[in-house]
């Protein structure tokens, strides 16, 4: 079961990369890792870095995938974004946000994608 879930997640990330590229984003990094965790995708468009969390679920509603991000996950994503900026010596005033690309795969194979800009904000 874990292998099937990992394959679905990897597939979802590939779909998200293609989607972002089609919408004018340049992918800067994929699966960026540090001791604190992983950022699925880092992309840039119009001078703004987007740290993208990809959520892929079976079902018909991409909102279900987006809604699966807990408060702890939101806090971790904020921390990881700051660590990425520091690791790449980017200026403190670099514009950035955390997006979610939610992907729902219906049983008939139809795919629904919802790109939520600035889905995670500081609280």
Curated annotation (Swiss-Prot):
One Pfam family per UniProt: UPF0102
GO molecular function, one term: nucleic acid binding
Classification via Gene3D superfamilies: 3.40.1350.10
Top-rank taxon, per record: Bacteria
Chain segments annotated as coiled-coil in the UniProt record: none
Cited InterPro entries: Restrct_endonuc-II-like, tRNA_endonuc-like_dom_sf, UPF0102_YraN-like
Cited PANTHER family: UPF0102 PROTEIN YRAN
Database matches in NCBIfam families: PRK12497.1-3, PRK12497.3-3, PRK14678.1
UniProt-listed HAMAP family: UPF0102 (MF_00048)
UniProt family annotation: Belongs to the UPF0102 family.
Protein name as catalogued: UPF0102 protein RoseRS_1723
Organism: Roseiflexus sp. (strain RS-1)
């Amino acid at each position: 079961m874990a292998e099937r879930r990992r394959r679905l997640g990897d597939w979802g990330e590939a779909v998200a990369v293609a989607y972002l590229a089609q919408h004018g984003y340049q992918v800067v990094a994929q699966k960026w890792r540090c001791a604190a965790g992983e950022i699925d995708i880092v992309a840039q468009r119009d001078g703004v870095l987007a740290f993208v969390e990809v959520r892929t679920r079976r079902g018909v509603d991409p909102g279900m995938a987006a809604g699966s991000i807990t408060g702890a996950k939101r806090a971790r994503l904020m921390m990881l974004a700051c660590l990425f900026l520091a690791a790449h010596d980017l200026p403190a005033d670099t514009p950035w946000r955390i997006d979610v690309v939610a992907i729902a795969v219906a049983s008939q194979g139809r795919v629904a994608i919802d790109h939520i800009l600035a889905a995670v904000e500081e609280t």
